[in-house]
Amino acid sequence: MFKIGVMVESFRKGLDGGLKAASEIGADGVQIYATSGETHFDKLKGANLVSLRTKLKDYRLEVSALCGDFGGHGFQIAEHNPKRIEDTKRVIGVALELGTSIVTTHIGVVPDEKSNPRYAVMARACEKMGAFAENEGVVLAIETGPENAITLKEFLDDIGLKKGLGVNFDPANLVMVCRENIPQAVKTLAPYIVHTHAKDGVNLKPVSAEQLYNSFAEGGIEGFHATDYIREVPLGEGGVDFDSYLKVLSETGYSGYLTIEREVGENPTADIRLAVEFLRSKVGKKIFPGRKN
C-alpha cells in the first residue's frame, strides 16, 4: 500500500526542523530539494552528507525522492541545457548516496505540436539525462502540470527510454492548469508513474500553461496574476477526487509515495498534519505518534 511522505521544505523550518516535524506527524519519508539552501547538491558531501544520513536514520525516515528542479524555463532553452544537464547528473549522484532512486524535476512546457522546435530541444535534454539516470539505476521523474497527460506520455514514448525517465504525478497541477480528469490521467501515464505529490487545487478560470509557467519562471509578468486563475487548497477541498484518484492509482499497481507538498498557507505544519490524517484515512492506516521528540 502507499507510503506517506512530506516535502521537508513545506514545513518552512529548515532541514533539522523539517525532519523533526515530519517524524512527529508520522510520515514514512521525506522529499528534499537538492538545488538550493543547505541541501544543495554542492553541499551534500563529506560530513554534511554523513550528518543528513544520520538524522534520517535517527528519525526513521527514508528519502522518497530528491527534487532536482532548477526553476526558470526548465530545459526549454538549448543554450542553458548543458549546465543544467550536468547539474542534474550531480543531483542523481547525491540521490544514490541518500538511498533513493528517484529525482523529480520540472522540465518546462512540452509543446502540443511536435513540429515546435522546443519539443526537440526538450526531448534531447531529457534523453541525455534519462540515459545517464538509467545507467545509474535512477529514474528522472518529470512532474505533471504544464501539459496534459496525453502530451506528456507521447513525449516520453517518443524519447523511448525504458527505465531512466518517469513521471512524478501531481494531481493538483493537472487540475489547476489543464482541468484534467485525474483518474483518466493516471491511466494514461501509469507506465511511467514512479512518485506522486499529494496536493489539491482549483482552477478558477481557463489559463494558458505557457503564460502561467512563464510567469513562474520570470518572477511575474506585469498585469498577470496566477492567483486569478489557480489556487492551491488543503487536501479534499479542491478539484482532486482523492477516493477515485487513489483507487485508480492502486489499480495500476503503484504502491509508492504520496508526498505532501504544501506551498501556501499560514500554518504549514498544521496543514500538513491534517493532510497526513486525510491520507491515512483514505488508505486505511491509523495515525501513529511521532517517532522521536
Residue map of PLM features:
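C-terminal/domain-terminus segments
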Residues: 256-279
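Active-site beta-loop-alpha junctions enriched in small/polar residues
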Residues: 7-11, 33-35, 68-71, 108-110, ...
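Active-site acidic/histidine proton-transfer and metal-coordination neighborhood
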Residues: 14-20, 55-62, 74-167, 176, ...
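Alpha-helix N-cap and loop-to-helix initiation/capping positions
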Residues: 43-51, 79-87, 114-124, 147, ...
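A short, acidic, amphipathic alpha-helical segment used as a generic capping/interface helix at domain edges
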Residues: 237-251
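Acidic/histidine-rich catalytic cores of soluble enzymes
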Residues: 4, 29, 66, 124-239, ...
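N-terminal pre-domain/capping segments
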Residues: 1-100, 191, 276-293
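Residues at the N-termini of beta-strands
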Residues: 29, 102, 195, 256-257
